[in-house]
């Protein structure tokens, strides 16, 4: 039996595929490569010594999904595929709803037809909107999202809740990520954004390597200890292991399960800059600029439910995140384009 990973050539997807292969799972990957490179899967094979079966295409393509389910004995689906830039989602809401909401719905419908009932969904802390309580627990209010990306994740969560009620065969696990950073310790796979990075650490590391002249810090007037936004940064390998734990715990269970995957600690943008400088002994020039639309001041998790139910905790600290990010960037100054 195999696991279908949509978006498996992407940043979080490729790291999760490594953990699945290391746990001796058979893996099938579907990715349209709009934000990723097929090289990531070649590197996954290098790391693990194992191959995945790869289909290039879109989750909106029902004929392709039917072909994948017909040709492979899929037992579970981990669904990463989707657009994920907060700022871009404000400019292109229709594309975000089409890819993230309609795409998820098409995938679920085809799973149902194929009799595949285990589903792990890559959600996001953005579903909490501007949180009323910090740290954020799974029972905190969702909705009130501040950008179309967050709204698209919230909408899919609502759809999944309704499907879980209506179709008791489904085992649905929703994983709400906080801010994934870092890279595999080998330096072979990591985050490789197209154009100017939307996420903080690739931005910092591209400044460090000389690809960008300086870091733009979006917003310095938030109500935080230094005025810059505070987030819960989690090492991507810890996040990947969380998917494996969720799959092992709930494969074959019925019902809906929701977990925060974070460290439970919040760091500001300037905290992260200082940590990167200290660990890697490099100066990062930065300038303070206006806030980005849709951004909030503070967001970090209470991950204790994942610890209790999945026996999962984030093991890698800030130093490891910085070290692995810089190792990946130095080894791959142009990302996968080298």
Curated annotation (Swiss-Prot):
Source organism (scientific name): Pasteurella multocida (strain Pm70)
Binding-site positions, substrate: 124, 149, 179, 199-200, 216-218, 231, 292-295
UniProt-annotated catalytic positions: 149 (proton acceptor)
Family membership: Belongs to the NAD(P)-dependent epimerase/dehydratase family.
CDD domains: UDP_G4E_1_SDR_e
Any single biological process term in GO: galactose metabolic process
Gene3D superfamilies per record: NAD(P)-binding Rossmann-like Domain, UDP-galactose 4-epimerase, domain 1
UniProt gene name: galE
Binding site for NAD(+): 11-12, 31-36, 58-59, 80-84, 99, 124, 149, 153, 178
Protein name, UniProt field: UDP-glucose 4-epimerase
